[in-house]
Structure formats: C-alpha cells, structure tokens
Regions:
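Positively charged n-region of N-terminal signal peptides that target proteins for export
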Residues: 1-4
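C-terminal segment of classical bacterial N-terminal signal peptides
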Residues: 14-20
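Extracytoplasmic/secreted envelope proteins and their assembly/folding machinery
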Residues: 85, 89-97, 108, 126-130, ...
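Active-site-adjacent structural segments surrounding the nucleophilic cysteine of cysteine proteases
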Residues: 22-123, 197, 231-236, 247-251
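Solvent-exposed loop/turn segments at secondary-structure junctions
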Residues: 83-87, 94-95, 102-104, 116-125, ...
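Active-site-adjacent substructure of cysteine-protease-like catalytic cores
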Residues: 149-205
Length: 251
C-alpha cells in the first residue's frame, strides 16, 4: 500500500513537468497587446495545427539558429501571428521594429492607423507599408520605389545575402496566399555555386501550414524569386512586382 501511495505521489509531482515538456516553446513570440479581429487572423488558431515530430516538415529552432559558412540568419529575430486576415503588412513592420528594438508601445492597431486608410480592413500596399515606417520615425528606407532601372537588376539573390549579412531584414510582398507580406531573415547557399538549391528563411505572420506555428517558414530561393509579384493586386502606380523594403534605424 505504501508503495502504491509513493508512486501516486511521484506521478502527481511529475505531471506538471510532463505538461511543460510537451508545451510548445514560444520564446520567439512577441506578446500580443491587441487583437484586431478576435474571430479570425492567424492568432485565432495559434498552435492548433502543430504536429510534434511531423513526418512531413522538419522543425528547426530558427530563433536560436546562428550563421555558418553557408547560412546567414538574423539570430533571435522574434515573430508574431497577425490578429486579423488583412494585417500581414502591419505585422511585418512590427517584427522589424522589434528586431531593431524600436517597437516601444506600438502594436498592429497603432501601426495600421498610420496607413492612409487607417485600420480599415484591406491589404497593405508598398506605399502604405512605407507610411508606417515614416509614422514611427527614425528609419531610413530603401524600397522598390527607390530602384533606378529594372528592379531585378538590383534585387538579386546576392542582394538578399549581402543585406542579411549587414544585419538587415528584408520585408517582401509576393503572391503567397494570393498576396502576402513576410520578412526575409535568413539565406543558405547550401555550400554550392548554383542557386538552384538555395533556401530563404522568412518570418511569417500567417504561419499555419507547416505543423509548427512558430512564425518561421522556408522556401526554395529560386521558386520564391520567380513568384515575387502581387500580380495586379494593387493599382499600377502602387507597384506589384518585386515589392520590398529594407528599413534601418537612422544613425
């Protein structure tokens, strides 16, 4: 009887620790301070699609990953899942502010209000994304609007690698999800001369499909590059092709 009691006591003591061991590690997450749309957004399904030891997706610790001779990554880049169906651009700006320790009290709501349409639900154009950096203040930006000549001659995969080596994330808008903003935070050449096997690592505010909602995603670099367009989502003057922003704090 004493042995049974002892085992029950041990089990009771260990149960909380077992639960902690199975809980997802969210050290990479920026805390939520607002919910733009409680009924939807990627945050509304937070971790519900996770599958530990998924046979289909590798689950790597991108948050603590460090650069190597082939990989360039922004170690400890934090992520957040967007709290509405339309605020991927707003969330991407938020994550960049966090990276540079410039987030302060800003959240999706305060940043979205800086767009010329305010927080009216709707996709964020390149111009509106820049408006948020301007509204926060203290940032220099280089974007598709600033490129002279053909954008593809400036925004190359080499440009991505070199920008990351400078510690600068790259905000990109392309046709993922039919139109989506993400932030490039890593690039691996895989140690070969060809770019065919290169991969990019992104901070993704709608990371619901890879069985680990940590806010990171991986894409074949060339496949991303040849799909780097919003198509005709925005008016022509707003730009749709190879839309990007490199924002850095002013010195």
């Amino acid at each position: 009887m004493k042995k049974i009691f002892a085992w029950v006591l041990v089990a009771a003591l260990l149960l909380p620790f077992a639960a902690l061991a199975q809980a997802p590690n969210d050290e990479m997450k920026i805390p939520y301070t607002v919910d733009m749309s409680p009924e939807d957004g990627a945050d509304s399904v937070e971790r519900l699609g996770d599958h530990k030891n998924s046979p289909y997706f590798c689950q790597l610790d991108f948050y603590n990953m460090e650069s190597t001779d082939t990989l360039t990554i922004l170690t400890n880049f934090k992520t957040q899942q967007q709290t509405s169906e339309w605020s991927c651009g707003v969330s991407s700006v938020l994550m960049i502010l966090e990276w540079f320790d410039k987030r302060g009290d800003h959240n999706e709501e305060t940043l979205g209000a800086m767009r010329d349409v305010g927080n009216k639900p709707g996709a964020t154009s390149l111009k509106q994304a820049l408006q948020m950096f301007e509204g926060v203040g203290g940032f220099d930006t280089f974007s598709t609007f600033d490129v002279e000549g053909e954008v593809y001659e400036t925004f190359t995969l080499e440009f991505v690698r070199e920008t990351l080596k400078e510690g600068k994330p790259i905000m990109i808008g392309w046709n993922d999800w039919g139109g989506h903003w993400q932030v490039i935070i890593g690039y691996d050449t895989m140690g070969t001369e060809t770019e065919q096997d290169d991969v990019i690592i992104v901070a993704d505010s709608y990371d619901t499909t890879d069985h680990n909602q940590d806010g990171y995603g991986v894409y074949p670099a060339e496949r991303f590059y040849y799909n780097f367009t919003f198509y005709n989502f925005f008016p022509e003057e707003e730009l749709n092709d190879m839309v990007f922003i490199v924002a850095t704090p002013k010195e």
